[in-house]
Amino acid sequence: MAFAMVTTAVQLTPTIDEPVYLATAEVYTQQHSLRYNPEHPPLGKLIMAAGLAFEDVGELDPAYPGSQSALGRHLLYESGNNPFRLLLAARMPIILLTLLFGLVVLAFARDVAGPVGGLIALALYSFSPDVIAHGSLATLDVPAAGLLFTAFWLVWRGRNRPYRYLPLAGLALGAALATRASMLPAVPLLVLLAALSMWHAQRAREPQPPTASEPADNPPLEETTEEGTADAPPKETTEESTADAPPKETTVRSATTKRLLSSAAAAVGTGLIAVAVVWIVYLAVDPHLRWTTPAGLPHPGGLKGLAVDWLPFPQAYRDGLLMQFKLELRTYNGFLLGHGYKGHLWFYLPAALVIKTPLGMLALWAAGALTMIFIPRLRVAALYVLPVSAVLLLVAMTGSRSYGTRYAIFLPLFLAVAAGTVALVRIRWAQVTTALLVLFVAVSSLRTFPYYLPYSNEAFGGTADTHLNLHDSNVDWGQDLARLAQKLKTDYPGEQTWLVYKGSGVPAYYGIAAADPYTVPVDQVHGILVISDSRVALASARLRQLLTDATPIDQVGYSMTIYRR
């Protein structure tokens, strides 16, 4: 997995979001300002800044007049920096985090399903094309999902040692919230589970009364007479001791009250620790918390607005949420199964997951979820895995931006644990089937190396056909400029080249001498025409004219198509 991710990180040029995150990370460390990329909390970008600290990055102008996207391009291409080195430096901490999350997957699944279950879960996580693809990039999706997953694992561990693990769960939850606000819907579930874990721990520590078949602990030795018979204790003494003992009902009520108070304290304490972590992250960027609410920022009102107002987080965090709500009010274009559309499709994300998840993994996810539900002793563990997966998926399905399975990147973590429980099914054919499905996942993942971002499973034609069904970060996120430059230099030297590119990279930096076909009449566009597949998916009328007389002859990274016209 490490080899696959490092190879991917070295080969890919900037995706659409990465320059913004890198520039913001540098502004954090150089200027201690929160003004860029406020729609996302700072922690993920501070993690990237840890990698950038090993590079000699030039000083950014505090008065730079451009947008955050322009600042990202300026940092990578206009400031004398090496974009390959900067990107790799920012991506390496994310890669290390992704590998560490794999160990958490192993530990969680081993706790629930034993060593074999842990290995099954680790194998599914390690071969997940989505995890490899997005864990190789300087983005926020995998860090946020992994930190939240770690929080749920620690809450699970808290069932046995609450005073050690529940505070750590609060730290992990706060870190997740300080990376992406989209983790907020999981907070009620986690604090309730913290209370449940404390309840279980307190109940397990209470002494259990002896049953009729069990003698009391340390029964008193009876004195014997010279004839060997026991002297019975005086009846009056026994009655007095019984009268002095508290009633059984009072003892039970006292124990229950203690458990309730401890559970409530665990829930509140875990939440307060998470809140403190978010504040500490913002203070780490700017100890003075200098922030001005942008003009014209709409307030949603209603329950959503009330929830934002009541969040115990810095104003910059709450305003970032309002910016996200503003973005959700827009109408976006989407592309699914070969058809473009405008607006929102509630089933887009489940359909995209079915396309981009290995078939064996889908089968094991489903089997694992059913196993956790139908095996009684696993139902408690299911509370720590399945509800959070369902809640986050349902919330993601309501979003207006149909841009990729990265919005559900938490599923390969949580459902890997569920899949590991199939190891507890002691049926010969089930064990053989599980082994074959894991092997199928591994083969499918290895076959797509190193093109993990545009992966799709065999039922939908494999990686080469992903662009026929999906777009944007599912297949073409602007990541293949370096591969395109090499392809043009090797296979099409000296030919007239035209380029329609979607991304944040600068083609000229990579030696791509291509003209813009939109600047001349259609009948003057002849030669090699390179088009990002995301542009083809949502082709404008002008682009459709260009494609009418164009013949596809080649592809680059399964994200760009080369035509001859």
Indicate where each model-derived feature is located.
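Signature aromatic-anchored transmembrane alpha helix within multi-pass, membrane-resident enzymes
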Residues: 188, 268-271, 373, 377-378, ...
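Membrane-interface transmembrane helices that cradle and orient dolichyl/undecaprenyl
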Residues: 110, 151-166, 198-201
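C-terminal luminal/periplasmic domains and tails of membrane-associated envelope-modifying transferases
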Residues: 227, 249, 253, 337, ...
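Multi-pass, polyprenyl lipid-linked donor-dependent membrane glycosyltransferases
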Residues: 16, 89-99, 116-127, 131-150, ...
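Hydrophobic, aromatic-rich transmembrane alpha-helices
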Residues: 352, 357-379
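Interfacial juxtamembrane loops and adjacent helix segments
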Residues: 30, 34-93, 290-342
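Short hydrophobic alpha-helices at membrane interfaces in multi-pass membrane enzymes
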Residues: 158-174, 255-261, 388-389
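Transmembrane alpha-helix segments characteristic
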Residues: 121, 365-367, 376-397, 546-550
